[in-house]
Regions:
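Basic, often amphipathic N-terminal segments
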Residues: 1-70, 76, 90-143, 153-158, ...
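Short, conserved, GDST-rich strand-edge loop motifs in beta-rich repeat architectures
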Residues: 145-147
Length: 172
């Protein structure tokens, strides 16, 4: 799949998320309009282009079933504990998906620096929307986001988005 960042030279900053709404390659957004999502792999910097990153992530999405989640209680994140989030109850399904995504990126020699060891899936509350405790959602997409792309003033651009369509991890 060709992406808007295909073949672009130099380092790029990226993040891998599970969006709550459909996102397509090429979609852009500002800081204030970040689509609601669960971060799967924290931001990382690499000179590897979007096509190679996507080629590593796409098979993972294809082999992973959609992930049903329930929104749990609210919490405050960040160094000052001033960022409102809603915790995500996932029945333990996101940690292996996260590890597999990290492994796929590391196989390309992507340096993930210091991934969090205390991963707590959550959705950050935004002015334009939020989730509520008790909401039941199904995470159906794995999405690669280019942060602060150099040719635009937007905060992010969707470099690739793949359906979670596999049977892996599905209940018997």
């Amino acid at each position: 799949m060709a992406t808007p960042d295909a073949g672009r030279q130099g380092s790029g900053r990226w993040v891998v998320v599970l969006p709550l709404e459909p996102l397509r390659a090429g979609d852009v957004f500002s800081v204030g309009q970040w689509p609601l999502h669960v971060t799967l792999v924290e931001p990382f910097t690499t000179a590897i282009d979007a096509d190679a990153l996507g080629a590593a992530l796409e098979p993972l999405a294809a082999s992973t079933a959609p992930v049903p989640v329930t929104i749990g209680p609210d919490a405050l994140f960040g160094p000052k504990h001033d960022i409102p989030v809603s915790l995500v109850e996932d029945g333990g399904r996101l940690a292996p998906l996260r590890a597999d995504a990290q492994d796929a990126l590391r196989a390309l020699a992507v340096d993930l620096r210091h991934p969090r060891t205390d991963y707590r899936p959550h959705v950050t509350a935004k002015r334009h929307g939020r989730v509520r405790e008790g909401d039941r959602l199904t995470l159906e997409l794995l999405t690669l986001v280019r942060l602060r792309p150099p040719e635009t003033s937007h905060h992010g651009r969707i470099a690739g988005s793949w359906s979670l369509s596999g049977r892996a991890g599905s209940a018997p």
